[in-house]
Amino acid sequence: MSDFQKSFSESTNSIKFDDKYRDNSVQPDDIGVANQWAVKTVADPCVGNLATPVNSGYFTKAFINNLPFYREGISPNFRGLETGAAFGYLLYGPFTMTGPLRNSDFAITAGLLAAIGAVHIMTALLVLYNAPGKAPNVQPPDATVNNPPADLFTRAGWADFTSGFWLGGCGGAVFAWLLVGTLHLDTIMPIIKNIWTAG
């Protein structure tokens, strides 16, 4: 420690600032009031899980808690079925409209096969998550999800979720394929295909 630093550490007098540098509009108690309503710790403050106006707001909590992964009262298999159906249905469109065969007669079938292939890859990743020596990670309650599903975070629950995900994903892609193959969409399919064509 230098002599300059030692003089400050041994000094018992508080440091005085010139009044021209002092902001009188901020009082010492103002910062505590802002901390009380804006950000609170959920459980252990060392973990860093904080309740903010975004993650503990009504809209965010209602949206997250109504997703099939966190909704109360449904089995892990149905959670996987609903999640997989959404993934398969939503993956079909980009694979069909932006895939390498988008301008051919096989675009609709190629999109179906690509979406089912992507669902198979995601299912393999879910199987690998359940394969290591320990059970799946159990999520503790936090500011957004008060009651995470306990039956999902077991080996059997995760296996049920995975099988439901595979079935729902393939079914969602097939459902999207059937919708695109109807006669009602024949008039707008060329318009949609020409949006992403290069050249």
Curated annotation (Swiss-Prot):
Q: Which UniProt keywords apply?
A: Membrane, Photosynthesis, Photosystem I, Thylakoid, Transmembrane, Transmembrane helix
A single GO cellular-component term on record:
plasma membrane-derived thylakoid membrane
Task: Return the Gene3D superfamilies for the record.
Answer: Photosystem I PsaL, reaction centre subunit XI
| Disulphide bridges, residue numbers | none
Which protein, by its recorded name, is this?
Answer: Photosystem I reaction center subunit XI
Q: Which PANTHER family match?
A: PHOTOSYSTEM I REACTION CENTER SUBUNIT XI, CHLOROPLASTIC (PTHR34803:SF2)
Instruction: Write out the annotated subcellular location.
Output: Cellular thylakoid membrane
The GO annotation for biological process reads: photosynthesis
Q: Record's NCBIfam families?
A: PRK00704.1-1 (NF001925), PRK00704.1-5 (NF001928)
- What gene codes for this chain? psaL
What membrane topology was assigned to this protein in its record? Multi-pass membrane protein
Q: HAMAP family under this entry? A: PSI_PsaL (MF_00447)
Family annotation (InterPro entries): PSI_PsaL, PSI_PsaL_sf, PSI_suXI
The family classification in the record reads:
Belongs to the PsaL family.
Q: Where are the transmembrane segments?
A: 108-128, 165-185
